[in-house]
Amino acid sequence: CYISNCPQG
């Protein structure tokens, strides 16, 4: 995931 695109961590 990325800096502001990580819903699960």
Curated annotation (Swiss-Prot):
Give a Gene Ontology cellular component term annotated to this protein. extracellular region
Q: Which residues, renumbered to this chain, carry the PTM Glycine amide?
A: G9
PROSITE patterns, alphabetized = NEUROHYPOPHYS_HORM
Query: Which is one GO molecular function term here?
Result: neurohypophyseal hormone activity
Keyword check for Secreted, yes or no: yes
Q: Which cysteines are joined by disulfide bonds?
A: C1-C6
Please provide the record's keywords in A-Z order: Amidation, Disulfide bond, Hormone, Secreted
Sorted alphabetically, which InterPro entries does this protein's record hold? Neurohypophysial_hormone_CS
Is Lipid metabolism tagged as a keyword?
Answer: no
Q: Where in the cell is it found?
A: Secreted
**Its family?**
Belongs to the vasopressin/oxytocin family.
Functional note: Antidiuretic hormone.
Q: What is this protein called?
A: Glumitocin
Q: Which organism is the protein's source?
A: Raja clavata
